[in-house]
Amino acid sequence: MTISAQVIDTIVEWIDDNLHQPLRIEDIARHAGYSKWHLQRLFLQYKGESLGRYIRERKLLLAARDLRESDERVYEICLRYGFESQQTFTRIFTRTFHQPPGAYRKENHSRTH
């Protein structure tokens, strides 16, 4: 494994551990010791997707899990994962899961709640 691949694996692990807070590419690059542009190029090269897309998709998967497994309000879930507003969260969630968060919850909510 090359040093660049190791760096990306370390960054992915750090991102996954910090998805509950706002993550800006600039901050991740600073944490990694790379420029924003260089880190984005490396990430795309080794992961086959953009850094921003990776973060957004991971946050959406966690939000979907929370919708299925909790009774928390959609607004609280959207804030937890750093979305700018509930409207933005709903638009991105709907584009990804083909239904708004409320409908997704109704259809997929765990039977234990």
UniProtKB/Swiss-Prot annotation:
User: Which UniProt keywords are listed?
Assistant: Activator, DNA-binding, Transcription, Transcription regulation
Q: Which GO terms describe its molecular function?
A: DNA-binding transcription factor activity; sequence-specific DNA binding
SMART domains with a match to the protein in the record: HTH_ARAC
Q: Which PROSITE patterns match?
A: HTH_ARAC_FAMILY_2
Q: Does the keyword Transcription regulation apply?
A: yes
**InterPro entries linked:** Homeodomain-like_sf (IPR009057), HTH_AraC (IPR018060), MarA-like (IPR050959), Tscrpt_reg_AraC-type_HTH (IPR020449)
**Protein task:** Probable transcriptional activator.
Name of the coding gene: ramA
Q: Which organism is this entry from?
A: Enterobacter cloacae
Ranges for domain HTH araC/xylS-type: 9-107
Its name, as the record gives it, is: Transcriptional activator RamA
Q: Give the annotated DNA-binding region, as residue ranges.
A: 26-47, 74-97
Matching entries from Gene3D superfamilies are given as: Homeodomain-like (1.10.10.60)
